Curated annotation (Swiss-Prot):
The gene is DERA. Its EC number is 4.1.2.4. Catalyzes a reversible aldol reaction between acetaldehyde and D-glyceraldehyde 3-phosphate to generate 2-deoxy-D-ribose 5-phosphate. Participates in stress granule (SG) assembly. May allow ATP production from extracellular deoxyinosine in conditions of energy deprivation. This is Deoxyribose-phosphate aldolase. Transmembrane segments: none annotated. Pathway: Carbohydrate degradation; 2-deoxy-D-ribose 1-phosphate degradation; D-glyceraldehyde 3-phosphate and acetaldehyde from 2-deoxy-alpha-D-ribose 1-phosphate: step 2/2. It comes from Bos taurus (Bovine).
Length: 318
C-alpha cells in the first residue's frame, strides 16, 4: 500500500454548508447500474483486476485456525493456475489484496501466510467491530494488540452516535487517536453508512474521517441491514475527490457487504474509473471487502476459458 495519508487540521467549514442532492445521486446510481458491463477478453482482464483488489474476508463467530489457513491459501492462489495459463497471466503474481479477519485470528493469518511464503497483508477489524459500542480505551487497545500480532492494515469502525448527534470534533478526535494507535499500519475507517441517517451525514463523516488521517474510507461492516449501495458510494467518492482537490492527498475507497457476483465487481470498477479515474483502480486505492465474491469471479473466468460453467468439483476451493 502507498504511504500514509496524514490528514489535516479539523476544518468544519468544509462540511458546515453541505447538503447532498439525493435525487441527483439516485439518478447517477441508476445510470451506472444500467451500463452494459465489459465483455469477452476485456471482461476477463477486469475480473482479474477485481481479484487483486479483494480483501478476502472471514468474520464469523466460528472462525478457527484451520479455516483461516484455507482463507490464506485461497488469497495466495485465488484462480486455478491452468485458467491463468490459458489467459497468459500465470506469471503475473495474481493474489488478493489482503486477508481480513477478527483481531483474535490475526496470529493465525500471519502464521499461515508466512508458511506459504507469501507477503499478502493481514487486515484486522477493530474498535468494537461491528457496533463500536465499547469504551474508547478498549477500542484503542484492540488496535494496538492487532498491530502487535502482525496486522498491517486496521479496519476501524466509527461510533455512529457521534455522527447522528453532530459531534464532528469528537469524531475527528477519536479517529486521530485510532490513527496514532495504528503506528505504521494503514487505517481504513468504516462509516457503517446504513446507520448514518442521511447521505449528507455520509458526506460529512467521510470528510471528517479523511481529515483525521484515514488511508481508506469504507462503506460498511457487512453486518448492517443496509451495506454497500451505489448512492452511498457516489457520495463517498465525491468526498474523496473533493478532499483530493483541497489537499492533494489521495484516500482509498472500500465498499463491503453484499458484493457477491462477478457482475457486481465490474460495476464497482466502472464506478471507480468514472468518478476518480484510472489512478484509483489499483489495490493501493481501491479494495472490495468480500467473502464469497472470489468464488463467482473464478466461476466466470472458468466459463470464459472453457466455454462451460464449472461443476462444484471443478473449483473445490471456491
Amino acid at each position: 500500500m502507498s504511504a500514509h495519508q496524514q490528514g489535516t487540521e479539523l476544518d468544519l467549514s468544509w462540511i458546515s454548508k453541505i447538503q447532498v442532492n439525493k435525487p441527483a445521486v439516485l439518478r447517477r446510481a441508476e445510470q451506472i447500474q444500467a451500463r452494459r458491463p465489459v465483455k469477452k477478453e476485456w471482461q476477463a482482464a477486469w475480473l482479474l483486476k477485481a481479484v487483486t483488489c479483494i480483501d478476502l474476508t472471514t468474520l464469523s463467530g466460528d472462525d478457527t485456525a484451520s479455516n483461516i489457513q484455507r482463507l490464506c491459501y485461497k488469497a495466495k492462489y485465488p484462480i486455478r493456475e491452468d485458467l491463468l495459463k490459458a489467459l497468459n497471466m500465470h506469471d503475473k503474481g495474481i493474489t488478493t489484496a489482503a486477508v481480513c479477519v477478527y483481531p483474535a485470528r490475526v496470529c493465525d493469518a500471519v502464521r499461515a501466510l508466512k508458511a506459504a511464503g507469501c507477503d499478502i497483508p493481514v487486515a484486522s477489524v477493530a474498535t468494537g467491530f461491528p457496533a463500536a459500542q465499547t469504551h474508547l480505551k478498549t477500542r484503542l487497545e484492540e488496535i494496538r494488540l492487532a498491530v502487535e500480532d502482525g496486522a498491517t492494515e486496521i479496519d476501524v469502525v466509527i461510533n455512529r452516535t457521534l455522527v447522528l448527534t453532530g459531534q464532528w470534533k469528537a469524531l475527528y478526535d477519536e479517529i486521530r487517536q485510532f490513527r496514532k494507535a495504528c503506528g505504521e499500519a494503514h487505517l481504513k475507517t468504516i462509516l457503517a453508512t446504513g446507520e448514518l441517517g442521511s447521505l449528507t451525514n455520509v458526506y460529512k463523516a467521510s470528510m471528517i474521517a479523511m481529515m483525521a488521517g484515514s488511508d481508506f474510507i469504507k462503506t460498511s461492516t457487512g453486518k448492517e441491514t443496509v451495506n454497500a449501495t451505489f448512492p452511498v458510494a457516489i457520495v463517498m467518492l465525491r468526498a474523496i475527490r473533493d478532499f483530493f482537490w483541497k489537499t492533494g492527498n489521495k484516500v482509498g475507497f472500500k465498499p463491503a457487504g453484499g458484493i457477491r457476483s462477478a457482475k457486481d465487481s465490474l460495476v464497482w470498477l466502472s464506478l471507480i474509473k468514472e468518478e476518480l479515474g484510472d489512478e484509483w483502480m489499483k489495490p493501493e486505492l481501491f479494495r472490495i471487502g468480500a467473502s464469497t465474491l472470489l468464488a463467482d469471479i473464478e466461476r466466470q473466468i472458468y466459463h470464459h476459458v472453457t466455454g462451460r460453467y464449472a461443476a462444484y468439483h471443478d473449483l473445490p476451493m471456491s
